[in-house]
Amino acid sequence: MDIKRTVLWVIFFMSAVMLYDNWQRDHGRPSMFFPSATHTAPAAAGGASGTGATTTAGDVPAAAAGAAPSTTAPAAQAQLVKFSTDVYDGEIDTRGGTLAKLTLKKQGDGKQPDLYITLFDHTAGHTYLARTGLLGGDFPNHNDVYTQLNPGSTSLTGDQNTLKLSFESPVKGGVKVVKTYTFTRGSYVIGVDTKIDNVGTAPVTPTVYMELVRDNTAVETPMFSHTFLGPAVYTDAKHFQKIDFSDLDKNKANFEKSADNGWVAMVQHYFASAWIPQQGAKRDIYAEKIDPALYRVGVKQPVAAIAPGQSADVQARLFAGPEEERMLEGIAPGLELVKDYGWVTIIAKPLFWLLEKIHGYVGNWGWAIVLLTVLIKAVFFPLSAASYKSMARMKEITPRMQALRERFKSDPQKMNAALMELYKTEKVNPFGGCLPVVIQIPVFISLYWVLLASVEMRGAPWILWIHDLSQRDPFFILPVLMAVSMFVQTSLNPTPPDPVQAKMMKFMPIAFSVMFFFFPAGLVLYYVVNNVLSIAQQYYITRKLGGVKKKPA
């Protein structure tokens, strides 16, 4: 039994360490074993003020080969146009008509009731914005100051379903651009229409670029866990491709460079933004580093030649909001993949589907976690029973095993032969309890990532003192229950004959319990319920086996 338990603990511990380290490296963070350069928070990336953010011509995407470069107009006074809908508070910078600030009014910051998550921002300490412009000539781009058309109400009132804000560029290269943002009630999808008017005397063939620009400042995540932060690309050909900031640093990023479908995104824990061009429109995809700590991902969509006096419309959608899986599935193919489960996606997605169905019946995510854990334990009960039966049989013969070890302690070969004979006589497999446990590990790891990645847990209460399942227990009641359950579970298992192993078995619950003090309450709730059910199962099976043995032959 001591061999089996040792193997299990070693497998579990090493798996946890390697998973954590691989997750670190996979998401651009330093490895515990292979040190690498780390990202630093950006300095003022262009800055922002009441007159709008400033940018330079050098940050305009490269145009197609042979195209004339765009120039920057003389400095002009820009403004920040504030707007408000039922889901957003934001600011549009008239320099470029750039979406420079976006606060999610239905997503609290988890700490103060009157503060909300700000997704887009452009300050001295943080840059994250969405912008567009034209390439292919000396055409308007995101450095030019636009003029708001038809200034008026910039708030979505009670009787409105949509809010439109339009901005007109100066004429450059014989071209004028009118950019219109359309906000819809209850929606995190923003319509972005780019109308290109040829007011010159010669045909023009511009290219529209749409990009997301972000620094590499890390977002807050639960301690001992990291989720992906950076650009992502989706196409029908290559599907979902994450791009590490570290690969952009080295100019080694590998992703699909052209398509007529899909989207580009910036992904972080719980939230994402994505440009979604029209399906069927050919576009080039790019992702690059543009400053010491500033990156961008975007698309360049060519426009057919526009004759003098004619115009062309390029329509796209911009998603900016929480990674709610069902909502994302209805917006664009593959967009739900920004909710990143990593390599356990194939198991995690069905688990979340089931968790969501249970929530639909009980209306509380905490109780949904409890019921899902109960359901999983019920499904795996036959495997757990086999494991506990094996453990019980090993516990029965432990005194005889210890006697054999003492008897042959000077001759390891004879000791091993005697132990194998004992196993054969008693029809006990020392590793019989391992396989059932190993089979269950991927499911429980997947459920861990489901609870960690699901924005639905943010602000979701359970009972009494648990007001947010995505935050740690404020009174540490669940972590204490977790520690107690681990000690009880350990005490039900046979004590290893080796004193060193026995001490290790006592130390491991302490080590893991300390970690759980910093985990989100939803995760700890899952592990507490799982442990309590495991204890009940083990106690029931052990009593049942004991009752059978007491019956007369």
UniProtKB/Swiss-Prot annotation:
Homology family: Belongs to the OXA1/ALB3/YidC family. Type 1 subfamily.
A Pfam family assignment: 60KD_IMP
Function: Required for the insertion and/or proper folding and/or complex formation of integral membrane proteins into the membrane. Involved in integration of membrane proteins that insert both dependently and independently of the Sec translocase complex, as well as at least some lipoproteins. Aids folding of multispanning membrane proteins.
Gene designation: yidC
Record-annotated membrane-spanning stretches: 7-24, 365-385, 435-455, 474-494, 509-529
GO cellular component assignments: plasma membrane
Name of protein: Membrane protein insertase YidC
Quaternary context: Interacts with the Sec translocase complex via SecD. Specifically interacts with transmembrane segments of nascent integral membrane proteins during membrane integration.
